[in-house]
A protein has these predicted regions:
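Catalytic core of the metallo-beta-lactamase
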Residues: 7-15, 105-157, 173-182
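Divalent metal-coordination and catalytic microenvironments
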Residues: 14, 24, 56, 63, ...
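Pre-active-site segment of Zn-dependent metallo-hydrolases
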Residues: 16-57, 61-69, 82, 117, ...
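Active-site environment of divalent metal-dependent phosphoester hydrolases
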Residues: 29-30, 58-62, 84-86, 102-105, ...
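Metal-dependent catalytic neighborhoods of phosphoester/phosphodiester hydrolases
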Residues: 63-73, 206-215
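Metallo-beta-lactamase
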Residues: 79-132, 221-246
């Protein structure tokens, strides 16, 4: 049976009956970017990967300096168009660049790029394999274009949704990530069997959090929002390293 294991933040390991896909790799930390929760794997302790998908070039979603320690440089990587050069610079050779609604077959797994909106160009993904369909929401805003995902993929088994509602204080509190409540509303549109919140433990550190960033989404608020707007969806809150069959 397919399983998922949270690594940290938006990095998730999806096991489609032995074919493992890693999302948005982030393994190291630096000033202004702290995991805020334990790290379940390092690049060298990961299992053999069938593919890596990466939504955008922000450090906490595309940590190639650290991920370069992963030994299989031929692992297929599916990334937003414009992100491939950096992966090739650190030695990865199997890079495919995509835009929304383009598809890539990686062995028995189908990867479809889907729309997103963030502070930089971004995509989300639908991953299909072993009879399951997974939506990975990276750290997008809740945009109307995501309703098309529900129309094209009417039987989503699992949705991985960001919930911290990140805002940039110096940019007049400009919001760049969906809130827990907006993620609950998106569950109402996508109607997944199971939803798992991601992208909520990150911290920039006490001073930067106070001066630069604002976020307040929690798993509890997400659970409450889903109960109101998508009561048929089961919410599972997972600690890093905790597996879930779906």
């Amino acid at each position: 049976m397919p399983t998922l294991t949270r690594v940290v933040h938006a990095a998730v390991l999806l096991d489609f009956d032995g074919h493992q896909v890693l999302t948005d790799p982030w393994f190291s930390q630096k000033p202004g970017y702290y995991h805020g929760e334990p790290l379940a794997f390092t690049p060298t302790s990961l299992p053999r990967l069938a593919a890596v998908v990466a939504s955008h070039r922000h450090y906490d979603h595309y940590d190639l300096a650290a991920f370069a320690a992963y030994p299989d440089k031929a692992v297929p990587m599916v990334v937003k168009r414009g992100m491939g050069a950096r992966a090739r610079e650190v030695g990865f050779t199997g890079v495919r660049e995509v835009e929304p609604w383009e598809q890539v077959e990686v062995g028995p797994i189908r990867v479809t790029a889907t729309p997103a909106k963030h502070g930089v160009p971004e995509i989300t993904f639908v991953l299909q394999g072993a009879g399951r369909t997974v939506f990975f929401g990276a750290d997008t805003l809740r945009i109307a274009q995501l309703d098309e995902v529900a129309r094209r993929f009417p039987a989503i088994d699992l949705a991985l949704l960001p919930i911290n509602g990140l805002k940039i204080r110096p940019a007049f509190n400009r919001q760049v990530v969906m809130t827990a409540e907006e993620a609950g509303e998106l569950c109402g549109a996508l109607r997944p069997r199971v939803a798992v919140p991601i992208h909520y433990a990150f911290t920039a550190g006490p001073l930067r959090d106070r001066l630069l960033l604002k976020y307040d989404g929690t798993p509890e608020r997400f659970q409450q929002a889903v109960a109101r707007q998508a009561p048929d969806t089961q919410v599972r809150v997972l600690a890093p390293g905790e597996p879930l069959s779906f």
